[in-house]
Design a protein with these regions (language model features):
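Alpha-helical transmembrane segments of multi-pass membrane proteins, especially transporters
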Residues: 107-108
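N-terminal leader/auxiliary helical segments
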Residues: 2-104, 115-307
Length: 307
């Protein structure tokens, strides 16, 4: 890729996040690599065949952990071919015809497991929590978590962008549907995202965001969400199809839709002076519990629509 084209693609990324807000990455690249790297330290807990596989192909696994986010414009595909679904994860695994591709496919499944927590719990709750501001949307809360990712993880992201994963890409290209962009264009944009992490300005922006906001994301808060995501990764890898996390939705569609409606209702009540912040805090605590319970029991999310 020429230097000019790379700069052009990097320049497109902020615009694309505005044009396709629904494609905002649930956990960002940094968090997914952090979670995947953690799982590679827990191999002794996995079934023997996965211990052997991931020990031999750790980089392919990590590439799989971020490859589900290659596609931009996901909502423009048929729901049966949405890349953030267990259906597609199974198809990727079925298409893996050698060990390196299988490691990538298991990384893809780990990505989906982590996103069940991000899209079904973390982001929906934060959207409701900041009901009295109009600016803090989906992408904002994903960026907030990225601000706490260690420098070593960003270095890993840049290293992966320079690896040759063409075999894995051919597998993914054969399974993942094109959107408004071809797989090749999506991949170039994605590589630009990984290289973007080298820019000090990007990391400085994330750090400044955390220091100046009135909406804290405390260490205890982060641990709650990320520990749950680690549990989802590990349990799905151990139990596979028997894992209760397979009932959770990686897109979080139902939870996000309900959260949007509740956020609007809370905002209207607050603006009309019919809801104090103390009353809202009490209600939000109950709603947070319902979201968490609904991860593995999606039908219980129906309670949110009548909250």
């Amino acid at each position: 890729m020429t230097k000019y084209r790379r700069k052009s693609l990097i320049g497109l990324l902020p615009l694309l996040s505005l044009v396709f807000p629904a494609d905002a990455w649930a956990w960002g690249v940094g968090v997914h690599l952090q979670l995947g790297s953690w799982l590679l330290t827990q191999l002794q807990l996995l079934p023997p065949h996965l211990q052997t596989l991931l020990s031999a192909y750790p980089h392919d696994y990590l590439y799989g952990c971020i490859s589900a986010d290659i596609t931009i414009g996901k909502k423009y595909t048929h729901y049966l071919r949405h890349c953030h679904s267990w259906r597609m994860g199974r198809q990727v695994l079925a298409a893996a015809d050698d060990d390196s591709r299988r490691a990538c496919a298991y990384g893809y499944l780990s990505h989906l497991a982590a996103d069940t927590v991000a899209h079904g719990y973390y982001v929906p709750y934060k959207l409701m929590r900041c009901y009295n501001t109009a600016l803090l949307q989906h992408a904002y809360w994903e960026m907030r978590v990225e601000a706490y990712v260690d420098q070593e993880v960003w270095d890993l992201a840049r290293a992966l962008a320079r690896f040759d994963f063409s075999d894995n890409d051919r597998m993914l290209r054969g399974v993942i549907a094109d959107t408004i962009f071809s797989f090749g264009t999506n991949k170039r944009l994605f590589n630009s995202l990984l290289l973007l992490n080298r820019l000090k300005r990007w990391q400085s922006t994330l750090a400044a965001l955390s220091k100046t906001t009135r909406w804290p994301l405390t260490e205890v808060d982060r641990r709650d969400y990320l520990d749950l995501a680690r549990d989802a990764l590990l349990n799905q890898m151990i139990e596979q199809e028997k894992s209760p996390w397979m009932a959770a939705d990686p897109t979080g569609e139902r939870a996000l839709t309900a959260a949007g409606k509740i956020r609007h209702n809370l905002q209207m009540l607050w603006l009309d002076g019919k809801l104090s912040e103390a009353e809202a805090d009490q209600l939000l605590l109950q709603l947070k519990g319902t979201l968490r319970d609904g991860l593995q029991h999606p039908d219980r999310l129906l309670q949110l629509t009548v909250a």
